[in-house]
Amino acid sequence: MGDMGDPPKKKRLISLCVGCGNQIHDQYILRVSPDLEWHAACLKCAECNQYLDESCTCFVRDGKTYCKRDYIRLYGIKCAKCSIGFSKNDFVMRARSKVYHIECFRCVACSRQLIPGDEFALREDGLFCRADHDVVERASLGAGDPLSPLHPARPLQMAAEPISARQPALRPHVHKQPEKTTRVRTVLNEKQLHTLRTCYAANPRPDALMKEQLVEMTGLSPRVIRVWFQNKRCKDKKRSIMMKQLQQQQPNDKTNIQGMTGTPMVAASPERHDGGLQANPVEVQSYQPPWKVLSDFALQSDIDQPAFQQLVNFSEGGPGSNSTGSEVASMSSQLPDTPNSMVASPIEA
């Protein structure tokens, strides 16, 4: 009965090593996401037998562990031409599900490097530029080997801009009906877009002559140019309709944020701040105390000034006065320079 009051003991979890299948009694357990546990001596690369710990990256595939180098070598994406892998800083060219280095993206017939905007065809034996693709197609038709209706002529594609090797590839669209060809999406480069936008700004509806000039300037097909102008006009029309709707809703549009209602405002241009004070301006003048004027007057060295001469004459001509100008000068030199030197003396009764 006494044992019933004891707290229940927690069940100890048992860790089993995925590598050897034995129980792990070590102090440290290496756990690989999500729930795989290993002995420190059992977690190693299946190819090079390098020990894997928390300081390196571990990859698991089909129950086997690999280091980063061997995993990329075995299962990483490789160039369809040279069969060499890509680094994280490489830019690649994609053609359907195949990936190429920029230097390897060449025609197999003439070895000309395909740049963004060039049309090419992807066949079983590699990439072909448009000229060599037409030669191969004419040769196959001239040899009396007509194409099967289930395998129509391969459509030409247009090379897009190079992208980073780390960017995931887009899944190609799969048609259920085999007799339909896949529509190729045309990707324009910056020079082609600049030419089309400049022409559109001058005339949104170019005539046939202008379209022919655009074909020569951009190297695009007439169909691509026609579709681009149609899409551009449609986008601008939708944008103008949306702007009109926003302008109509703006007078009645109010924003309510956490119970506070406000009217949207548009920031204007900055302007100079006038202050807007109601008080009148006050003119501030410098104030000079009287003792400073007297002290400056006494320290003047030029005795020929009229004010000083007048003071001397007054002292000489005054009744009962025997003082001279030198005495006046000596008395004036005894005047204090600053008010701090003035000390009040008691008055004798």
UniProtKB/Swiss-Prot annotation:
Known partners and oligomeric status: At neuronal promoters, displaces LDB1 from LHX3 LIM domain to form a ternary complex in which ISL1 contacts both LHX3 and LDB1; allosteric structural changes in the DNA binding domain of LHX3, induced by the ISL1:LHX3 interaction, may explain differences in sequence specificity of the different complexes. Interacts with LHX3. Interacts (via C-terminus) with POU4F2 (via C-terminus) isoform 1. Interacts with POU3F2. Interacts with POU4F3. Interacts (via N-terminal domain) with MLIP; the interaction represses ISL1 transactivator activity. Interacts with GCN5/KAT2A.
Spans annotated as Disordered: 312-349
GO (cellular component) term, any one: cytoplasm
Biased composition (Polar residues): 321-343
Record SUPFAM superfamilies: Glucocorticoid receptor-like (DNA-binding domain), Homeodomain-like
Keyword list, A-Z: Activator, Developmental protein, Differentiation, DNA-binding, Homeobox, LIM domain, Metal-binding, Nucleus, Phosphoprotein, Repeat, Transcription, Transcription regulation, Ubl conjugation, Zinc
GO terms of molecular function: bHLH transcription factor binding; chromatin binding; core promoter sequence-specific DNA binding; DNA binding; DNA-binding transcription activator activity, RNA polymerase II-specific; LIM domain binding; metal ion binding; nuclear estrogen receptor binding
Keyword Ubl conjugation: yes
InterPro entries: HD, Homeobox_CS, Homeodomain-like_sf, ISL1/2-like, ISL1/2-like_LIM1, Znf_LIM
Reported induction: Down-regulated by beta-catenin/CTNNB1 in mesenchymal stem cells (at protein level). The down-regulation probably proceeds through ubiquitination by WWP1 E3 ubiquitin ligase and protein degradation.
PTM notes: Ubiquitinated probably by WWP1 E3 ubiquitin ligase; ubiquitination is followed by protein degradation.
Function: DNA-binding transcriptional activator. Recognizes and binds to the consensus octamer binding site 5'-ATAATTAA-3' in promoter of target genes. Plays a fundamental role in the gene regulatory network essential for retinal ganglion cell (RGC) differentiation. Cooperates with the transcription factor POU4F2 to achieve maximal levels of expression of RGC target genes and RGC fate specification in the developing retina. Involved in the specification of motor neurons in cooperation with LHX3 and LDB1. Binds to insulin gene enhancer sequences. Essential for heart development.
Region feature LIM-binding domain (LID), mapped onto this chain: 262-291
Protein name: Insulin gene enhancer protein ISL-1
Any one GO biological process: spinal cord motor neuron cell fate specification
CDD domains from the UniProt entry: homeodomain, LIM1_Isl, LIM2_Isl
